[in-house]
Amino acid sequence: MAEGAVFDAQAVTDAVAEGIAKIENASTMEELKAIKTQYAGAESAMTQASKAIGALPKDQKKDAGKLMGKLRADFGRAFGTKEKQVKAEEEARELAAETVDMTLPVNRKPLGARHPLPKLMEDVEDFFISMGWQISDGPEVETEWYDFDALNFGPDHPARQMQDTFYVKGNQAKDAAGFVGSNMVLRTQTSSDQVRGLITRGVPLYIACPGRVFRTDELDATHTPVFHQVEALAVDKHLTMADLKGVLDKLAVAMFGPEAKTRLRPSYFPFTEPSAELDLWFPDKKGGAGWLEWGGCGMVNPNVLKSAGLDPEVYTGFAFGVGVERTLLLRHDINDMHDLVEGDVRFSEQFVMGE
């Protein structure tokens, strides 16, 4: 209805009816907005008719106003009802599109991989804890007395030489036991913590001492200057080699499975007497099942007991130690020590958690 046109009740009624019909057929909010602009916007027939009422004779304005009010109400009611319906349908479609099918297989995120060395350390600690033993964690910078003297190493023993041991320059100490003037070293064995345990914890004593140790070895396929040991010490009345052998057999089974077993070969260590090399029966050995060297062990030397203030006529004890890296190499058929220390993530990925 053009500007200045006369009010045409039939034309505006027909236009509104047409708009309501289109509203009923609309299926999207975009369609509804376009219909509203066309039939109720500023240029629509309904708006133009409302403007034309002002030009009508006074006796016709009232009826024209009522008609326009009814038409606007009808249009608005139809639009509002359809708008709610379309919005509900669109929301339902969006929800359906976002629905997660719980039966579908998921794309699993890669699992993290821990380095196998600390994991094996935890396994060993769990073994001893399961037997009621205590875990002892001593200092890595140690007095020479604890690392050598208390373990029956003579003053001229080759292990004391600077080509075998890292000495901490310019340091002497008075340790907790009151020994003055002892040089400081990076501990060469966790046996030093066994002596600490004897002095500070008393007897009966059953401790395992895992940790890092340091020796002046070159890094190659089988050696590294920083490595890990787990040494164990039991001191009580009436302990024998049979008790030692029983613990070693249990440890072998825990680390390598039910087919694992151990044997002892005579050897010499300053801090044990008698001493033995510890061999492991290894069914998966290349070239066929056989024995492999695993560690060292023996009954605690009476001089070590005396250094801790114990009477060797009353107390006996046994001790043994195994290399954690050595255990790991055997357990997982790793051929080169470099793999353990170079931090290549591809190596750790072989030991993904949960697998």
Swiss-Prot record:
Q: What is its main location?
A: cytoplasm
Which GO CC terms are listed, alphabetically?
cytoplasm
Question: Which Pfam families does the record cross-reference, listed alphabetically?
Answer: Phe_tRNA-synt_N (PF02912), tRNA-synt_2d (PF01409)
Give the required cofactors: Mg(2+)
Alphabetized, the UniProt keywords read: Aminoacyl-tRNA synthetase, ATP-binding, Cytoplasm, Ligase, Magnesium, Metal-binding, Nucleotide-binding, Protein biosynthesis
Q: Which reaction does it catalyse?
A: tRNA(Phe) + L-phenylalanine + ATP = L-phenylalanyl-tRNA(Phe) + AMP + diphosphate + H(+)
Compartment annotation: Cytoplasm
User: Could you give a GO molecular-function term held by this entry?
Assistant: ATP binding
Q: Which family does it belong to?
A: Belongs to the class-II aminoacyl-tRNA synthetase family. Phe-tRNA synthetase alpha subunit type 1 subfamily.
Q: What is this protein called?
A: Phenylalanine--tRNA ligase alpha subunit
Organism equals Bifidobacterium adolescentis (strain ATCC 15703 / DSM 20083 / NCTC 11814 / E194a)
Task: Give the gene name.
Answer: pheS
